[in-house]
């Protein structure tokens, strides 16, 4: 047969091989070649008619190279079990006009009716939080941790599900410390987060169709975390990662299409309120003088709020002048616009500034709608409603002050409502206009003052939560929630007020002669005498204490936050960002072998594999080596006395259901400086100072003789004993914690202090006194 006819087909190209620089896996770095000296001379000789090169072969003297690193190995427990914690959570839920709120702080709220949640979040994840989600039926564990007191953390896979209409931006942080500062919330604003190279966009299905409906992100262990076996109690409160997320708008990044301008408008109190802003009872006389000055200024009554606040009081026959009852018609100005006679009024809060109005009732030509008799009605209405509130609430209402009343007080809608009969005759406020794209942040200041503060100036001690040199649209993002966490007051929206200083508004919110002067803004609904959201149902207690607080200033912060670039404009009633997580753990330990024997002839049900497997999950807080039986505790078929004594100290669980935490566990902690911590502790209990050892070159009697003698005279013996007992108790607690930390270090179970929660590191043990 002609086998030569079928010749082998030649390759027209070389055989494919992988290029070394295109390998899938990274190769190990090659050790550099040893440098050799100059080549020796070669002696050649002719043999057999041909020349042959000849070398002198020397024996190379080698040297053993030392290892640069050694591998430290750790013996693993006898029993190991992999566990995946899989669950679903809403990263954030944003209701209508709640863009500037922090969802992590409001995730457990029960307020209804009204919008829920917030447009940004600062979530953290710990093993305790994962167990809490398991108790809420929000996740499942693939393996039980019962009797396995050791654990290893391997990382997590996150799956973010894309929304049909709304875009999101997320940022995952694994670098400790996992604490909030005054710059955390502003950095999560979409305008700031869009410039972060570590941020990840979660586009909506409308913005990017045709792609997967989820985005997967693999996250490793935290930085500076050593991968080894730890007791579950040590990793229970260690922060594994934090997720920063915010709603954004990629289709309309520079303003909503439903508005015709990007300029924000709001109102601030005029300078007449500067020294009368406090609500303390000892400032009541100054408030009464200011209220009299405001109520005597007749042009302030040129608004429809005068009818809403005073007409029901007059129609009920409560306005009595002498023996006659005043009617509403007798309060109106009946002078026709046929004369040019004028009337001069002294502007409230001043003694020399006068304003001229015509005597006629045409408000379009600087006339007054009401006559001089209206100025007494507001005060009478405020006094009557204040006494009625006292009678209704009884002893539970102790602060009766008509100057802070709803109908005719200092902050009544009669003086502060922006809707005037003529726009050129405003009330006791100033209209402010703000363009977010002209704000450079230089000179901006945002802080809060307690309601008892007597002025509007910034004070380093009394003022709190200062954010400076940032654009107002970024500083307003998540500001109220940061103030609540920083001060520790969960009711701060009723106990503090917001102040703003900015040179980028029109007119400028600053005083050049007083750089610390601030201005108090308020929302449109507060000026109209309504609750946030536009509801007219004002509670009776709030009607007796009607003054600007953070509750009535939140809408101003909301408008400022929504004016920034890429901000979500709350065009939908409610949006949410869903997330699936898969935390990877390994449980380990040396448990006692338990043999469970069941009756093979009796089965309660026969359902095959359709019934989900039930797992016994133990709280990691109590799953410690001290509260677990091990193989070495079991000898000769019995448990040892030490093991039984150790297990008897196990705390028992109570069946009392608590009302829940005031703040969700998923919300991140806030960073406190040492000075702020000392101030807080001094408010809670008297300071306890450690005795300082006096060097031999100092004379302690000369330095402390005066102070000690005065203190000993004022304090009794019992007070000194109580203070010493308190000092000894605190020192005992600190020493026990210190010995516990030293023992963990000796057992190679120590964790980096930056990964521990606040107060769990060694540095916090010595913060007793300066």
Curated annotation (Swiss-Prot):
Coiled coil: none annotated. One of its GO terms (biological process) is DNA replication. GO terms for cellular component: T=1 icosahedral viral capsid. Belongs to the anelloviridae capsid protein family. InterPro entries: TTvirus_Unk (IPR004219). Residues 646-656 have a biased composition (Polar residues). Keywords: Capsid protein, DNA replication, T=1 icosahedral capsid protein, Virion. Residues 703-717 have a biased composition (Low complexity). Its main location: virion. The keyword Ribosomal protein does not apply. This is Probable capsid and replication-associated protein. It is found in: Virion.
């Amino acid at each position: 047969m002609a086998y030569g006819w079928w010749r082998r087909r030649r390759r027209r190209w070389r055989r494919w091989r992988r290029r070394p620089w295109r390998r899938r896996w990274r190769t190990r770095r090659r050790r550099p070649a040893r440098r050799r000296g100059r080549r020796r001379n070669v002696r050649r000789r002719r043999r057999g008619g041909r020349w042959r090169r000849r070398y002198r072969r020397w024996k190379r003297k080698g040297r053993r190279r030392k290892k640069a690193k050694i591998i430290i190995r750790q013996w693993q427990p006898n029993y190991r079990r992999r566990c995946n914690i899989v669950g679903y959570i809403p990263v954030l839920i944003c209701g209508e006009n709640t863009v500037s709120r922090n969802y992590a702080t409001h995730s457990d709220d029960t307020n209804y009716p009204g919008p829920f949640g917030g447009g940004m979040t600062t979530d953290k994840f710990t093993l305790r939080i994962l167990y809490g989600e398991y108790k809420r039926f929000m996740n499942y564990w693939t393996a039980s941790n019962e009797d396995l007191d050791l654990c290893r953390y391997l990382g997590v896979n996150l799956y973010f599900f894309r929304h049909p209409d709304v875009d999101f931006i997320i940022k995952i942080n694994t670098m400790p410390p996992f604490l909030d500062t005054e710059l955390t919330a502003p950095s999560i604003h979409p305008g700031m987060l869009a410039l972060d190279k570590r941020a990840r966009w979660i586009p909506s299905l409308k913005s990017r169709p045709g792609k997967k409906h989820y985005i997967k992100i693999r996250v490793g262990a935290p930085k500076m975390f050593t991968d080894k076996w730890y007791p579950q109690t040590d990793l229970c409160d260690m922060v594994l990662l934090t997720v920063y997320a915010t709603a954004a708008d990629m289709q309309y990044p520079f303003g909503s299409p439903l508005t015709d301008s990007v300029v924000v408008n709001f109102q601030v109190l005029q300078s007449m309120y500067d020294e009368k802003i406090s609500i303390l009872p000892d400032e009541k006389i100054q408030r009464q003088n200011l209220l009299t000055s405001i109520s005597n200024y007749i042009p302030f009554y040129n608004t429809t709020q005068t009818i809403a606040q005073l007409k029901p009081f007059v129609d009920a026959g409560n306005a009595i002048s002498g023996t006659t009852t005043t009617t509403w018609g007798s309060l109106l100005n009946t002078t026709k616009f046929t004369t040019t006679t004028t009337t001069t009024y002294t502007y409230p809060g001043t003694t020399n500034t006068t304003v001229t109005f015509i005597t006629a009732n045409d408000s379009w030509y600087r006339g007054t709608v009401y006559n001089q008799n209206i100025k007494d009605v507001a005060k009478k209405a405020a006094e009557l409603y204040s006494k009625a509130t006292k009678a209704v609430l009884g002893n539970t209402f102790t602060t009766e002050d008509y100057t802070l009343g709803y109908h005719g007080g200092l902050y009544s809608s009669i003086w502060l409502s922006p809707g005037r009969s003529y726009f050129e005759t405003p009330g006791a406020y100033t209209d402010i206009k703000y363009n977010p794209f002209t704000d450079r942040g230089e000179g901006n200041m945002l802080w809060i003052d307690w309601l008892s503060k007597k002025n509007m100036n910034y004070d380093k001690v009394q003022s709190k939560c200062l954010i400076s040199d940032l654009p107002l649209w970024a500083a307003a993002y998540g500001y109220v929630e940061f103030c609540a966490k920083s001060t520790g007051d969960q009711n701060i929206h009723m106990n503090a007020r917001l102040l703003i200083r900015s040179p980028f508004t029109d007119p400028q919110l600053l005083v050049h002669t007083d750089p610390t002067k601030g201005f108090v803004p308020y929302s449109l609904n507060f000026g109209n005498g309504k609750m946030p959201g536009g509801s007219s149902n004002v509670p009776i207690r709030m009607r007796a204490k009607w003054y600007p607080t953070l509750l009535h200033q939140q809408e101003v912060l909301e408008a400022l936050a929504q004016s920034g670039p890429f901000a979500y404009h709350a065009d939908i009633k409610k949006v949410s960002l869903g997330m699936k997580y898969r935390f990877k753990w390994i449980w380990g330990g040396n448990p006692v072998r338990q043999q469970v024997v069941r009756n093979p002839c009796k089965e309660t049900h026969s359902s095959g594999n359709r019934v989900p497997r039930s797992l016994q999950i133990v709280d990691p807080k109590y799953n410690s080596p001290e509260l677990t039986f091990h193989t070495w505790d079991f000898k000769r078929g019995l448990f040892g006395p030490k093991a039984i004594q150790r297990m008897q100290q196990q705390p028992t669980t109570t069946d009392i259901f608590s009302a829940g935490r005031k703040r969700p566990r998923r919300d991140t902690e806030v960073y406190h400086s040492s000075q702020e911590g000392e101030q807080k502790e001094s408010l809670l209990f008297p300071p306890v100072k450690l005795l300082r050892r006096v060097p031999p070159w100092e004379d302690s009697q000369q330095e402390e003789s005066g102070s000690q003698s005065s203190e000993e005279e004022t304090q009794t013996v019992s007070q000194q004993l109580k203070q010493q007992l308190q000092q000894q108790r605190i020192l005992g607690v600190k020493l026990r914690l210190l010995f516990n930390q030293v023992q963990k270090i000796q057992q190679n179970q120590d964790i980096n202090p930056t990964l521990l929660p606040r107060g769990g590191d060694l540095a916090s043990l010595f913060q007793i006194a300066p």
